[in-house]
Amino acid sequence: MLDIQLLRKDLDGVAKRLADRGYTLDVAAFSALEAERRAIQTRTEELQARRNTLSKQIGAMKAKGEDTSAVMAEVGGIGDEMKASAAKLDEIQARLSELLLGMPNLAHESVPVGKDEADNVEVRRWGTPRQFDFDVKDHVDIGTPLGLDFETGAKLAGARFTMLRGPIARLHRALAQFMLDTHTQQHGYSETYTPYIVNPEILYGTGQLPKFADDMFRVEKGGAENTVTQYLISTSEISLTNTVRESIVEASALPIKLTAHSPCFRSEAGSYGRDTRGMIRQHQFDKVEMVQIVAPESSYAALDEMVGHAEAILQKLGLPYRVVALCTGDMGFSAAKTFDLEVWLPAQNTYREISSCSNTEAFQARRMQARFRNAQGKPELVHTLNGSGLAVGRTLVAVLENYQNADGSVTVPEVLRPYMGGLERIDAPAQAS
C-alpha cells in the first residue's frame, strides 16, 4: 500500500508515476474524498472545542446555582453531531483505503519506463546454449516416455495438471532438495515449512487481494465451520512474508532470510490459450521461494544478492540464462523493482522466465504493519523482498531439454546425482516386444 501522506503532498506526481505502471489514478475522486475528510475533521475539531467551552460553562453555572438545561441540551446536540461526523469519517476512510488497496506500488527511479515485456531491458547473459547434432525434442516428447503423465493428470484434475512418475518424479524432488540445500547451506536462508491454506487478510498483506482474487483458488472448511473462505497459496512468499505481520522486530534481528519449498496454486484466469502444451503454465506447480525482510537502507543490496542466489542455482545446474530488468508496465503489482531470470529452452529456441526477484520496499510492510525498531528506538516499516529460487517444474523442463540425448535419454546434471542415488542418466524403460 502506498503512503497516503505521499498522495496528499504530491498527488499529480504520484498519478504520473502510477500512469507509467499502466494505472490511472482517479485524481478527482481522491481529491473529493480528501476535501470531504478535511471538512469533517475541521468541523469535528470546532465541535470539540465548543463542547469543552460549554462543559466549563456548565460547571460555573452549577456553582452559582443557575439553570443549565439549555446549555446541557446544546452539549447533547453537539454529541449527536459528532457521532454522525465520526460515522461519516469512517465511511470516507474506508473508501480511501479501498482506493489505496487497488493502487500498485511506485516503480523505483532506476526501473525502465515501458508498456509491456517488449520494453524490458536485458542486463546480462550466462552460459552458451548447447549446439545439438540431432533434432531436439521439447520436454513433453522427452519426458513422456520417462514418466511425465499429462493424460492421468488431466483425468484426475483437468487441464494444466500433470502427474510425475518414477525417475522424473525423483528428478523433480532432487531439484527441490538441491535448491533448498544450496540456499540454506550457502546463502544463509532458514528453511521453513508453511501452511498451504491462508486467511484472506494474509493475502491483503502481500497484495494478492483484493485485485487478484480471480487468480486464486478459494477453499471452504467442511462441516459446521464452512462460513470462512480461505485460499490456497499461489506462492510461499505469501506465508513467509506474513510471518512478520503486525509485529515489531529488533534491528539486530535483520535481515530475516527465509526459504521454503511448497506447491503453488494458480487459476491462471488470464492465460487462456497460452502455453497449453506441457508444464510451463500449470494450475499446481512447485517452487522454492526466497524471502528477505530487511532495513530500508539495505533493500537494494539485498535485491542484488537475491538475484545472485537464484543465478547460482542455474549456474550449478549448467543451464544458460539471462537476467532481465522489468519495465514499469510489466512488473508485478507489489514490486518497486524486479529482475527476471530466463532460462534457455532449446525446443522453443528462446529464453523463458524461471525466476522473478522483487523488492517491494515498504509496500507490503505497510499493508501488514510489519515494522522494526530503528536506531532511535522508533518503529519503522521494514522492506520486504521475494524471489523464486527456483520454479521447480520449469527447472525440470529446462533440465530435460538441455540435457537430452539423441537416444531419448536424459543426462542427470552432476550436482543432482547425489540426490539421485548416483544415477547419471535417465533412460526410457525398455518396450515390451
From Swiss-Prot:
Protein name: Serine--tRNA ligase
Subunit composition and interactions: Homodimer. The tRNA molecule binds across the dimer.
Organism taxonomic ancestry: Bacteria, Pseudomonadati, Pseudomonadota, Betaproteobacteria, Burkholderiales
Pathway: Aminoacyl-tRNA biosynthesis; selenocysteinyl-tRNA(Sec) biosynthesis; L-seryl-tRNA(Sec) from L-serine and tRNA(Sec): step 1/1
Catalytic activity: tRNA(Ser) + L-serine + ATP = L-seryl-tRNA(Ser) + AMP + diphosphate + H(+); tRNA(Sec) + L-serine + ATP = L-seryl-tRNA(Sec) + AMP + diphosphate + H(+)
Binding site for L-serine: T235, S236, E237, E289, S388
Database matches in CDD domains: SerRS_core
Gene responsible for this protein: serS
Organism whose genome encodes this protein: Burkholderia multivorans (strain ATCC 17616 / 249)
EC number per UniProt: 6.1.1.11
GO biological process: selenocysteine biosynthetic process; seryl-tRNA aminoacylation
Keywords on record: Aminoacyl-tRNA synthetase, ATP-binding, Cytoplasm, Ligase, Nucleotide-binding, Protein biosynthesis
Primary location recorded for the protein, binned into one broad class: cytoplasm
